[in-house]
Amino acid sequence: MKASEIFKQYIWLTDTIYRSGGISLQELNERWVRTEMSGGVPMTRMTFNRHKMAIEEIFGLCIECQRKGGYYYYIENEEVLKNNNLQHWLLDSLSIS
């Protein structure tokens, strides 16, 4: 898989979690399967975890899991998006395309 395709997956994942305000892995996968990127194949937990680590490394965004009341993933440090104009612009412009 090309690096640009993986990067698009990071953007999609970040954007989906951010816009939802909290999302279960099941719901995330339901949305994922409906994208062209997925090819109709669900995202494995291993892939999700690798993407989650890469997103933190590249964008500085921490995707955490709220275990109480269900397992919901959310961006713990949303202020990074609000305070870092370059990262915000990049995520914004790439999530539109």
Where are these predicted regions, by residue range?
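Short, basic/aromatic recognition patches that contact phosphate-bearing ligands
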Residues: 1-96
